[in-house]
Amino acid sequence: MAMKKLLIASLLFSSATVYGAEGFVVKDIHFEGLQRVAVGAALLSMPVRTGDTVNDEDISNTIRALFATGNFEDVRVLRDGNTLLVQVKERPTIASITFSGNKSVKDDMLKQNLEASGVRVGESLDRTTLSDIEKGLEDFYYSVGKYSASVKAVVTPLPRNRVDLKLVFQEGVSAKIQQINIVGNHAFSTEELISHFQLRDEVPWWNVVGDRKYQKQKLAGDLETLRSYYLDRGYARFNIDSTQVSLTPDKKGIYITVNITEGDQYKLSGVQVSGNLAGHSAEIEKLTKIEPGELYNGTKVTKMEDDIKKLLGRYGYAYPRVQSQPEINDADKTVKLRVNVDAGNRFYVRKIRFEGNDTSKDSVLRREMRQMEGAWLGSDLVDQGKERLNRLGFFETVDTDTQRVPGSPDQVDVVYKVKERNTGSFNFGIGYGTESGVSFQAGVQQDNWLGTGYSVGINGTKNDYQTYSELSVTNPYFTVDGVSLGGRIFYNDFEADDADLSDYTNKSYGTDVTLGFPINEYNTLRAGLGYVHNKLSNMQPQIAMDRYLESMGDPDASDFAADDFTFNYGWTYNKLDRGYFPTDGSRVNLTGKVTIPGSDNEYYKVSLDTATYVPIDNDHKWVVLGRTRWGYGDGLGGKEMPFYENFYAGGSSTVRGFQSNTIGPKAVYKNGARTSGGDNDEYEDCTQESGCKSDDAVGGNAMAVASLEFITPTPFISEKYANSVRTSFFWDMGTVWDTNWDPSSAPSDVPDYSDPGNIRMSAGIALQWMSPLGPLVFSYAQPFKKYDGDKAEQFQFNIGKTW
């Protein structure tokens, strides 16, 4: 042993010359210190083998090769005669990774970043990488204004050369902006310029965008906003000279100073376009026209470049280059814009592929495409396909990816990546709605039946006032041209009194069939035929009902039956960005019906629904929604429209904050009628000669409803569920009236129900959730304009209604 130590000491002492330039032949290789790494694996990583002649350079290469494996903290190579002695110290293996004190950064995100750097359980620990991670995390906190933050890696040794790794965070508090100064501005005040920033030194309570917490990225965005503000107003020489960010000694306050040079305003003198225009010079020229004397505007220049790219993209030039170079003339304060265009190659579509459609068949998606395989690539056609897939309502998200075909100079594949949502439900259960009380529901509803695109529904409902069942089927592509065919059969037993309406019972059944004819991308016409049988009973005579029965020649009937055949028609304009929870676009839906010969009744009825979504931010998280609903109907040939076909308002789908159906005309019962009491649970006879006023709604033949909503991000909801939950603040208004009402036929204390000016209003908040059980809608509204007989209902909850 003493001899060995002496040998090693002598080797170390003479390490510079032990191998010699002439080298020596390696007869054997021994390792010391290996634990986890196998000898064979270590030998394979070495450039030296038994029998090789090695010198100093070979030994250096061996040390580098062993270090390069990442398995060792220290490597020494010694000579013992003709034996190489390799002494190593293995890096410890990570047994566990934990985090402490991190609030701004989630554990999952930290684990992903660590794994990307090669730090994971079961791998060896590289302390150099660990130091880089500490610094990187601290830099992240500094970028979001937390200058007192610190991140420390605590390594705890364990048996068998293992360690526990714990990252300890001290995040501290975000530094708040104390003051923002802009130096060098003369044309605009500092207050005016800062009002366009996200970062503020003062934030009013009503400002939901401004923020006093400093973030490096937000400052960069604000500086770009400042630059654009000046460039859009003709200041072509504008420049941000410098930016100083000063930190208070306690690291809790920030002072920002921006030094600028405004320069003078410049006007455009002309636009000159050159380059490869691919034969579209006339169209490009239209996009580059300017008004004489127009101020230079950076945003308009960028938009012009984008418009040229979009134009060329429609003709298959998928990767055009458009560069604008302003030529500034300081003498006359003008700018001549030189635009260089290179259309590049025209690309053709080899294949259109779909990814993520595990349920929906390819054919269902492919029939929505406007881009054809083999044709040149049209960016507008690809976008139309995306819009049409979104409007189906089958998918949470739809993304497109244009991929160049390897080895081909002019071919691409277009890939549509979809994320399917649950388009169907099977339910059997008991529910509660504020409009319907306790309800029993059972049914199957599938908007994408077996992935074919068919909509199939078998539904039944039983609640306090209704027993309803329906079977419906719709084929959206009955023909290859997109003509749809839909039909349904239904049965309904309706107790009007229990629905806060006038007293009568209506048992009805019927069927209808409808064809839909697409006119273009956004417009569809519908036409169809329907049949319905209505059996009325338990009718308590009231003025509106009596007026109808009299027109039918049976004024004293307490029971009545009618069979009607109708011609149904409709028109839909749909330019919404997606089928559910839209954020942009408009939808207009006109529906109507008119009785045809062979019917007992003679009347027509038409309604118009509109909805417009206007996003106010680029991410479409803040959206303004305007909705209207109009309805009108009347009798034909001297007959009245049936009272059971009247329009109603009030409830979650019209004017929230009011009980369902309670807005508008109320029943005025005739002398001798059995009327309901105020709580709809006690009855008494009407004994007044002129009739008895009541709170029972009868609806009207005309309706107008409007709503203004402000859709906001839902607080406390992660991005994963953001597309399934919607929160909005709303203002509803509406009314129902009877154009055939005769005030002289009712007691003097009864309002004039022919007056359309009796508008009800409410305001509140709504939450919609696309739950696994179906759409759930919660709303709380406070009526602030109502009339005699209206019934308030602040909280409302329903299943299956969204807008």
UniProtKB/Swiss-Prot annotation:
Q: Which Pfam families match?
A: Omp85, POTRA
The domain of life for this entry's organism is Bacteria
Gene Ontology terms describing biological process: Gram-negative-bacterium-type cell outer membrane assembly; protein insertion into membrane
Q: Which family does it belong to?
A: Belongs to the BamA family.
Its primary localisation, in coarse terms, equals membrane
Q: Where's the POTRA domain?
A: 24-91, 92-172, 175-263, 266-344, 347-421
Q: What is this protein called?
A: Outer membrane protein assembly factor BamA
Q: Which Gene3D superfamilies match?
A: membrane protein fhac, membrane protein fhac: a member of the omp85/tpsb transporter family
Subcellular location per the Swiss-Prot or TrEMBL entry: Cell outer membrane
Question: What function does the entry list?
Answer: Part of the outer membrane protein assembly complex, which is involved in assembly and insertion of beta-barrel proteins into the outer membrane. Constitutes, with BamD, the core component of the assembly machinery.
What NCBIfam families has UniProt attached to this entry?
Answer: OM_YaeT (TIGR03303), PRK11067.1 (NF008287)
The residues the entry assigns to the signal sequence are 1-20
GO CC term, one of those recorded: Bam protein complex
What is annotated about its quaternary structure and interactions? Part of the Bam complex, which is composed of the outer membrane protein BamA, and four lipoproteins BamB, BamC, BamD and BamE.
**Keywords assigned by UniProt, alphabetized:** Cell outer membrane, Membrane, Repeat, Signal, Transmembrane, Transmembrane beta strand
Entries under PANTHER family matching the protein: OUTER MEMBRANE PROTEIN ASSEMBLY FACTOR BAMA (PTHR12815:SF23), SORTING AND ASSEMBLY MACHINERY SAMM50 PROTEIN FAMILY MEMBER (PTHR12815)
